[in-house]
Structure formats: C-alpha cells, structure tokens
C-alpha cells in the first residue's frame, strides 16, 4: 500500500519532466529554395537548419518521390546534389524535409525551383537540306528556309542564324547568300551556271543570344549543317564560235558542193549544250557560198576571181550560229562571225583585144574588138609602127595564167612584126614594119594582118584583124640619116628632159619646099614627148607618165616635112631606163593554221617587183624580222619558203596570244636605194589535246552516313592545253559505290578546274554496308586519244544508323498459273534483301488485287494464293482458280526486319507480284437466248438469203474461245408428223467483239406447196490448240407458210395507186391483224371482168409464232377493226378473196345469169305459196305470237348499233347482224314443230297480219305521249317485240332499223 502512495507522489513530477521536452522546428526560410540547373552533382545545394529549445541533438532527412535528387548529411543538415537537374524536364518539384531530436520528428514541405541555364544548343528541325534553283532567280528571292529550336528560355532560347562558309569559297560566292533572322536564305547576288558555280554548299550555324552557364556568360551554337544548292542552267547565253576568226581559200573553178572549211560553235550554256545550226546571214557575194547545218561551208554557185580584183580576191560571208531552242526570253539564241574566203586564180580566160589606150581602158568584156585600122607610108622603114592603131591586149588571169604570146598571121604577115611578142596582164600592141620593100603602095594600097594572142599555159587564143592603109609618098622628100634611132631616157625623168638633139633630116629637093619642120606622129605615147619643130630636138613632155613598169619601150614616128609638104619619117625606139621606184608587192595575205606537234608550216611568200626584170631593181630577197618566236622558223631568202624548224608547241606560246604567232617577213629588192615591203604571216598553232589533266595529290575525305547531299571534298586538276575545247576538264567517278556521289566540275582559270564531291541529294550512306569508298577520280578532256589521269579518293563513312530491307526485283517477275487445279504447291518465292548484317527478314502479304481485262473484279481471287513468311508463294485453292473470273492476280507484298532499331523504318516498299492466270479450255460455247420465231415463206425466199441466225459466246480466251458453226442435221417435219432430211441450208460465221453469229442461208429454192416445219440442229464448237474441243448444239424451228394462206385483196384503184399507197395499206392491215404482211405481187384486173375492182394484191399474213391467217380469219379480223376497215375502204379496198378467185369468162357469166333467173322465178313462186299458207294459219300465228311474247319477256334487251356493211356482200361486220345468213343463238319459239310445217317463216319475213292480243296487258300496254297521232294497230309479233323494248330511249328505237348497202354490189 506504501508503494501506491509513493507512485502517487512521484507521478506529477514525472509528468512535469515529460512535457518539458519540446520538438524541433525549421526556420521560415526552409519552405523554398532556388537551384541553378547547372549545379554540379556533389555540390552543396542548401543546408537544412532547425532549432530545438531543448538543445537536443538534431538529425535531418529528406523524403518523397523527388528525394533522389539530393543526399543529406543527417548530422549537419548539409544537402548535396545527387542527380543532375534539368530545367527543361522538371522546372520545379517538392520534397519533404524532416528533423528529429530523438524523441520528436518535425517535417515540412520544401519547394525546389530549378533555375534555367544556357545548357542547350540550338537544334535544326529540318529533315532535308538540299534544293535546286534556276540561275535566273531574281536577287532577293528566298532560296531555302531553315528552322532551329533552342529549349532554353529568355535570350538563351532566342536563335540567330549564320552562314559560316560557302563552298566553293570565292570572293563572289562568299557574299552570294545571306540569311535572315527567320532562317530564310536569300539570294544576295546574281547566279551564273557558266561563269560562276553550278553547285553551292552553305555551312550554316544557329546560335542562341547568350546566357549564364557555370556562372559565366555563354553562347551556345548548334552543330553545323550543310545546305546543298544546285544551280539549274537556263538558256540565257548565245552560242559562241570556237575560233576568233576563220579563213580559207578555194579555186575559182571549184565545183558546186565543194567543201571549203568548217566552222564550229558551241552553246555557251554548258548545262544545256543545245544543238547549234548554222546559216549564212550576209555575204559580199550572195549565192557563191552556203553552209550546212553541221557548219561545213561549201561552194553554192559559180566563182570568178576576176570579179574580185577590187576586193583583194576575197569573199566575206557572215555565218550565224543559232541554237535549236529559244532562250529564256522567247528569242533565238544566235551569234555571227565574218569568214574570209580567198578565191584563187585558175586559167579560165583567154587574152582579148581592146581599142583603147592605157591606162584608160576599162576592159569590159563587151568592149573587146576583133577589127582594127592603121596607117603607114609606103616603103616605111623597118620597125616603123603603124600609126593610128590603138590596140591593147588583156588577159585578166593572174601570174603565169595571165601571160600570153603575140604573133602575126595572114597573107601580109611577112611584111610586119608585132611588138611585144610576150606580155602579162595588159599591154599596148604595136604592129611595125618588118620588110619595107613589101610595103609598096603601088602594089597594094591596103594590107591585112591578123594579130594572134595565145595563152602561154592553156593555148587559148584570140585573133584581131588589122587593116593597114598604105599612104603614097613623093619621090623627093626629106631623108633621115638613119631609119631607126635607138634612144634611152630614165623613167620618171623631169619634164623637158632632152632625149636627143642629134636627129637631122635632109631633103634632096633642097630649099624648094622650104625649111624642114619636125613633128611626132600621134600614137603609142607620142603625147609623152615633144619635138622642137625647127631643130628636131626631142624632149620629154610629161616625165611623170613615163613608167617603165607600164611600158618599157616607146616606138615613135618622127616626121620631117619640107615646105612642099613632102615628109618622111624615121622610127624612134625610146627605151625607158629603169630606176628602183617600185617596192616589192606581196600577193595575198597569209594566215596559216597548223596543228601543234606534228603540224608543219610550209608557205611560200609570193611577191613581185614591177621594176625591170633580171636587174637588181627586181631581184627580191626575203628575211624575217626578229621576234619572240622567229627563231623557230626558217625563211629561204631567195624563194620565200617559210618553214618551221621543229615541232610547234601550243603550250610554249603565251596564252594571251591564243596560239597566234605573227611573223614579219621583209621583202626587199636589191636596187639602189633598196625598197622593201613588210608582210605579216599569222601562224595559228592549233591546240591539240596533247596534255593530260593532272592532279596535284591524292585525297582522303570523311562524311557522316544518312546525310543526303553532304559535301565531301574538293579535288583539283590542271590541263596545260590552252584552248577551252582541249583544256576543258570533265571529272568522272569510278569505283565501288561511285554512283552514290556526284562530282560537280567548275572551271577556274588557266586550265585549272575543281571538282566538288557531294553525296547525291537522295543518297544516304550506310555505315554497316560500306565503311569506306575507294574511288578513282578521272580527269579527262574530249581528246581523240581517250586518255585521262586519275587520283585516288578515299571516303570514310562515319557511322550513325541503318536501312530498311528491299525486295529483289528478279523474284517479283511475273509468273503464270493455269486454272482449274492444273498446278499445286509452291509456284515462286519472293526474296528480300537487307544490307544490315543482323537483319531478320519476313515477307508479308499486304493486298491482293483481282483484275479481269484490266477491270477490278473485287475479292474473287483472294483465297487462291498465300505468302509464307520466308517469301514462298503457294497455291491455296487450285480448283478455285478460274480464268473466266479473273485474268490477273496481283499480290502486293512487302518485307520487314524484325531487328530494326527503334526510330527507323522496318518495312520495305510494296512490291507487286503479277500472277497471270492461263486459260484452259474448260468452257464449252453457249448459245445466247433467242426469242425470235423464224418463218419462211418459200414463195418469197431466194437462195443465198438468210432465213435464221444464232449467236454464241465462249468464255475461254484466244483459240479456246474461237467458235465454228456447223449444221449437224436438217429435216422437214410435215403436219402429219412425218419427216425427211433435207440439204437446203448452210451456215456462215461472223464475229464482232467476241460475239459469234451464225447466219443460216438457203442453198436452193423451197417448195411452196408443202406444209410443215424445218428443224435445223446447229453445233457451236471451239478450236483449242491443246486438248479436246468442246461443243454445244441447239435446234431451230423454221416455220413454213404454204400457198394455201395466200390471200388476194381487190382494190378499186389501179396497180400504180396501190403501189403508191402500199405503206398506208400495210399499216392498216397490220393494225387490224397484228401480223407481218408479206406482199407477193400487185397486178391490174381486166376492166371487163369486174364492175368496180381495178387491181389486186396477193399477200401473206403471218403471226410472230409462225402461223398465218386464212381468208376467213382475215375477214373477221378486218371487220372487227372499224378504224382499219374505214382506212382500207378509203384506200380502195373492195373485196377480200382467196387466190383461187378468178375472173369469170363471158360464157360462165352468161350461164350464171340464166341460173339466177331460174332461181328467182322459183323464189317468187315459193313466196306466193307461203303467203297463202300464212293467211290460212293466222290463228296459229297468234298463238305463236303470244308464246313469243312470253319468251321475249324472258330475254334481255340487246340493242345493237348499226354497223357498216361489208362491201360486195349482204353481210354486216357484227355478230348476229345477218338474220338471213346466221341462225339465232336463242330459240324464240317461232320455229315450226316439224320440218313439214307449212307455216315456217324466217325472222325477217314477218307479215303485217294483226293478232288479237290483249292490249291492256302490262307487257304490251303503250304509254301514249300527249299530242301523238293515233297509229294503226301493229303486227302482232312487231307489237310484242316493241312492247318488250318499252323503256328504251328513242335513239335506241331508231337504231333498230337500218338499210343494207351491200345489196348495191354485183358480187352477189
């Protein structure tokens, strides 16, 4: 009990000590913390700080889903980062922090905010980085657009774009593009496929605008991307000629079509290389030359060098090169160049004579003369020229071709000479006295000679006749001491130069005739000299005209005249002394084209000097003016032959000269002083492709796989040839995998070219397939040797990831399967390929397409085939395969790789396996249903005429579906059932759109008198190439209509009228009978045979089932159709009869009349007797009338409207309308009880006898109308019938009576 008191005493103290231990608490700043996302793992993130009023030791902890980010020191509260933070993934999160003093635990929720840092680089979002643009794209156009994204925020996420590098890197291309803030790449300058580059690669980089990272400012940039830009060449440039000038020579006698030279032009648009054609657009001599489309200039007309003397013997033609297609401006792209063609001389002219004086001759061919007149004194001294003769000989040819010989012919040729005897070009011709004794006026007053000019080369000649008139002289005349004075004078001497003062004449007559005066007779240059009349001194009158090169010797006649006018003459031979006054003249121009290396220069400089031949003044010496390349040539100083001393090398010539070596040849004479002429000889050393392009190194490049269009690297080559045609370097790639790359060539300068190696825009390299590409780059130019140089290029593929499988195209080749269970099991196998080494491939069926004749037929073939996972194709339902249901089965398959890495396409493209279903002859032909009834009217059907037809099809194809028809059996079945075979039919075949038609034709005429049906069995059989043929039969019934159904219709109109109304008649007959009307004949009737009918028509009326109408049936049907009957009557129908109805002859007509009279007489007697008997039997008639009344009350009223009478009869077209011919259907009790009853009467033979009847009877009581006059008592039977019809309308009563117009005809 004591311990209980002790416990009660200590319990309050214990409670006080427990309640005094307070729990720890966190500070107010422990609810939120901000940490940068770039805080390194392991760094102190923050401290957990708590306080405990009891100063107990505290421990710390962190819990919750995000506690893994941190690690905490439980004793110190230091919190370190355990996992990296990422603002872009988790921008903020919560953790639970806790502290404990060992007894109490305090928790709190802390918000951790992650602060963004610039830790992300921009990433391009584009999937493709290639494009193509036209070279004419306007400046400022957007070429391509890129987009990059930066996941950071603020300025760190603001993306800017930069163009780091442009390949090729030139001053022009570096500024060719610019990129906008939105990523649009804009063209900054003009493009040119030919003058700049055809391909560009832009290295782009995207950078953010900067931010803080690791406590420092940081700007992040993306990995570079490469944008490939292909420039598409546009036709914007004109063509250009390969050479800067063209020249050639051709002989003037060249035939039409002779090739002169070839010009060549190329399209300046290298990427298009359009076809260039050539034409002559202008010419100094139109029509002389033309050009073919391939650039060959040829002779197109007759040439004549002599017409070109004023044009330096050259023809200029303007050649225009035109591209085949229009340029981008819609205009022709063309360029022009003048071509020089020198026409060389041939000896095509003979010398001619002209009546003129040099140098004033025009030498027009029309002015050539053949007759000349001259004068000379008799006994003139030898070598005295004929005065008054102005003859010039001229040959327009050049050089030796223009040299000719002069001679004399004729009866007086011995008396004269011609001077000169040899000349070239043009010369004044003088005829001089040779034998003065023969020149005797007393013997001949007129002498004739022929001057012959003969071509020195061709022996062509011309003849001129000179008529010389002799002058008579006196015997005493002045006499010169010499008959010929040989004088000399320098050419071009001063005017007044004294030639001689030694010539004197004496006159034997003394002074009788006065002093002697001297004068020069005109002609042959006499106007160039003058003589002093008194002294005889000879001086030069005009020294400037004395030119030895034009005329070396002048033959003048000096006349001495005495006072008696007697005169004498002497010959003056004045020879001009040559001075060196003419420099050498070089013929033509010299442009030589020679290929380098093996080409040889061999050209002779042709020159001449007009100074005196065989003197130093005309002796020419050739020399070369020293120059840069003159040492490579030799020039013969005497002949002017220029040769090269060794092989010429185009590459040794300054490229600026473009292969042209201009040599200056000095042509000098040896006179005093020496005169010279310079001529330039242009030797164009034509470049040949004798230098190979060379590379300066081998190349190693690397490229990432799966990056299409990536730039790989650049190779360079150099060609020493100088012309663009020969140093144009084209690059080509060879080696395994070369087709994955494209090498874009770009011409640099001075024979250098570079090739940019790119991946094709649509090619993605695969590291697993090929890690290295060992390529060979070939540099070649279009030389005939076909040689090239190469460089090794190694491309290393850097690995990224892989490719989808592909289907083997060979395994998808179309196969054929025969229908209807002909084949089973596997028919083919689809093979798939995958360049990946770990590929696990399967084949799956994607779709099945069933088509027949190109038309989709749905799912009819879906179960026929199956595809196994290994690609094996099996037949599932062999028996179900049916060609007639489906012609072509298309299995759409694809391959997939089970081991494809995520993110890559595991499926191949769909492939189509075509399975052609081969037809088997499994379908017999079948006849198409034919509801037509075939009817034969033998009288109307002729041989070779179609009487029936069948149509058949065969669902098989080709030969299996071709149908042939045959008649297996044909028999005639009579109406009594008997039959017999016939051979009267044949069958022909036609086909249209797969439908075969068999036409059954008659072979011979049919018998029109027999009745029955032809049964024809037709067989359709196909024509298979393999296996048995299949056939089908059908039997046709051909109904015959014999002559018993022939009906004759008589008309009141003529045969012609019936024929004209035939269509209306047939239409009315068809309307009434509903049959087909077959007209046999239409004939006129003898006018004496009938009273009304004028013509008849025989016809058949046949139903569609093969039956025909008889005469009776036709009558009934026509009577029933009132509209048709009315129309036929209007068209003249009179009688319908059988064919046997013939017109009676006169004898028969007479017999008929007699018989008719006898019958009429008997009839009259019978009527009289009958009337008497009826009077006696009136009582019996009364009884019968009463009985008839009773019967009439039992019979319904039938009011029959009057109908039209049938023409030619006493019958009406209504049933029971003819009481005489038709028996009543109801017995009214009027018949006699026995055949011997004398009181028997017909219904239309009622008399007027009255019968005592009860008129008050209800049945017979008449209702009188007011005002009606009294009527006589009716005949008893009439009253009975009238009473029965009481109540009918008045119109009905009126219609009970009619008049029969048929009684008007004579046909009774």
UniProtKB/Swiss-Prot annotation:
InterPro entries: Cadherin-like_dom, Cadherin-like_sf, Cadherin_CS. Residues 1251-1308 are annotated as: Disordered. Disulfide bonds: none annotated. Pfam families: Cadherin. The modification Phosphoserine is found at residues 1245, 1297. Residues 1288-1308 have a biased composition (Polar residues). GO terms for cellular component: anchoring junction; apical plasma membrane; brush border membrane; microvillus membrane; plasma membrane. Residues 1174-1308 are cytoplasmic. It is found in: Apical cell membrane; Cell projection, Microvillus membrane; Cell junction. Intermicrovillar adhesion molecule that forms, via its extracellular domain, calcium-dependent heterophilic complexes with CDHR5 on adjacent microvilli. Thereby, controls the packing of microvilli at the apical membrane of epithelial cells. Through its cytoplasmic domain, interacts with microvillus cytoplasmic proteins to form the intermicrovillar adhesion complex/IMAC. This complex plays a central role in microvilli and epithelial brush border differentiation. May also play a role in cell-cell adhesion and contact inhibition in epithelial cells. The cadherin 1 domain is required for binding to CDHR5. Part of the IMAC/intermicrovillar adhesion complex/intermicrovillar tip-link complex composed of ANKS4B, MYO7B, USH1C, CDHR2 and CDHR5. Interacts with MAST2. Interacts (via cytoplasmic domain) with USH1C and MYO7B; required for proper localization of CDHR2 to microvilli tips and its function in brush border differentiation. This is Cadherin-related family member 2. The gene is Cdhr2.
